[in-house]
């Protein structure tokens, strides 16, 4: 891998990162130049199917987004939010963790549970219940037995250690899931109406903090990996699977809910797919602002991590927090109390440029809007046709 930001990329580099040739050309058009490796890596994860929904967003937009009890439009926040009466709201989310679970079922399933819980409490809601919906292949296969044991244990262990009960679930077996299982985890939480926090960034000069666990090399390019087809050779992608720590997440939950009550938080987002890259770009695009981010300030678990590794890491139990200027010490005190990292790694800027620095060197300069779903990310309308079995199924009559 290139180590210098001066190394310009080619269409071959783009293809290796999962981008199409035409997408590489679009990136050059957006930037007005050829991207360096760090910038291309940023686009590769943000324009992956996992982050951008580029092959499905056209259809998803046709679904209803609002209703009389909805407090956030569908897709507007990191979790749904519905008024349930008496001044309370239910925050909920369901998310798949299929690819990671297919390779490393225990950690894949466990980190799926951790991720959805962070999306819930990052909004200010306290998680109260978890559910799951699972699909596996032929139960006679040894691989299926291995997957079932790992996934069920991963879901149970993370939920138990985190302290949130799994109140229900379902499981089905079919040969079509022999290679790629479906592992869907759901979490629901309760929050008072009007006390939620949005995943947004604004206010020139407001400090940007990373809180929670330290950053390692686990999960790098995880979003791009989750967008690929699984094959028998996918085991080499094991480093793209994240590693979770439910005890750390429990501390992060309590610290997050406490810091929200201080009134010092402008916006907050979990670092899930694409890590720092996704959080900084989505929060900035939503607030129509920019950020200067100092990557060498990020607490790391391993020495000599490269700038693009820090940007793309999907290490778990981390969040990005934008704080009201002048309230830094107040926020720091809360996370110190819970023995968690709380380090200022940047500041909000005017305009919509994301500028990432490493030891004073500008390593990437990209417009936030160009990266995100609903903004500059590609949208495709693929050809489709009705599967043959569907016409046969329609012939079924229950009275027959």
Task: Outline where the language-model segments fall.
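Glycine/proline-enriched, intrinsically flexible loops and inter-domain linkers
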Residues: 1-400
